[in-house]
Amino acid sequence: MNKNTIFSYRIQGIWSAIAAIVLSAGLSSCSDLTRPEALDLAPASQETPEEALALIRAFKQTPHKVMILGMDAVSDNPVARWQHPSSMPDSADYIYIRNLKGGLDAVLASEIGAVQSGKGTKVLADVDYVAIENAWDELQKMKEEAGEATGTQEEFLAFISEQTRLQLECMNAYGCDGVMISYTGSASSTVGDPVQGRSAYINAVYDWWNSNGAGKIIMARGYLLNIASVDVAEEFFGQCRYLIHLVGTKTSAGSVASDIFTNTIMGVPSDKYVFEATVPTPSDTTQIGMSVPDAAKWISASSETEDFEKLGLCVENAQDDYFRIGRNYADIRRAITILNSGTEAAQ
């Protein structure tokens, strides 16, 4: 048996271990909820936990379908394990953290380096356009209440550029491997042309990245079709390692494929796609759109009618998958097994 075959068998054992992890922290005490240690893999048949993590790090260097997870930053006093980057499944390739500009608790910040070195997981700072618009709207409401004139379109565009820069700078401030550029539409009700706002945002990213992005990773997620209308879209897409398309409320692969066909016509590259699905929330267990395991099955399957690459899966609200009785991150772990083995492990 050659070395590569042995490595392959051992990796398959790791995926079995991933699928078998259960919620060890429990809900019995506050200390269990807040301790920051990683929920590491139970050792496979012949590996210690350290050896298992070494195999996962090695696997992440090989061609495979990637898993990207999104989580929220907590600026002070995390109270639950799901708020910790270290609690995310060991086999996640990337974690992007939202709202780092609002600050990150020191304990959580220290875990960024730990997951990078221990698990080989890349950590990205999220740069969110909607958050910028929301901040602008709040500022305008305060001005109106104070009887002051609201900002002009020119001031709004300058605000976008400045706030984009501040979010981008979180990459280096927290030792991240790169950035996730999130454009999920225009939410502002106090400004005019949303196209100008979108253009200011992407141009600010593009200019900053050309000066500060050497050796780092950039991805884009959201409404890629809208980004395609920006004047630097071709160059910007060229910089991105992955382009993350939102499945949204769609439940059929055909509907998603139709969206990609339209994107391609409008200039979005077809060879960088990762697809984003969501898990139900603790407050509403209704599945919206394609489930994470179903999305993984579609992504791992080949099709002669799909003229685009399916490179992996993104889960925007990964933290919500923590809340399972008896098993944390159940849908994500199932999806990881499906993506990397083509089959679903026994549940």
Task: Identify the meaning behind each predicted range.
Residues 251, 271-347:
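Substrate-binding cleft of secreted/luminal carbohydrate-active enzymes
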Residues 63-130, 134, 331-338:
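N-terminal carbohydrate-binding/catalytic regions of secreted carbohydrate-active enzymes
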Residues 66-70, 124, 202-230, 240, ...:
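Aromatic-lined carbohydrate-recognition surfaces of secreted/lumenal glycan-active proteins
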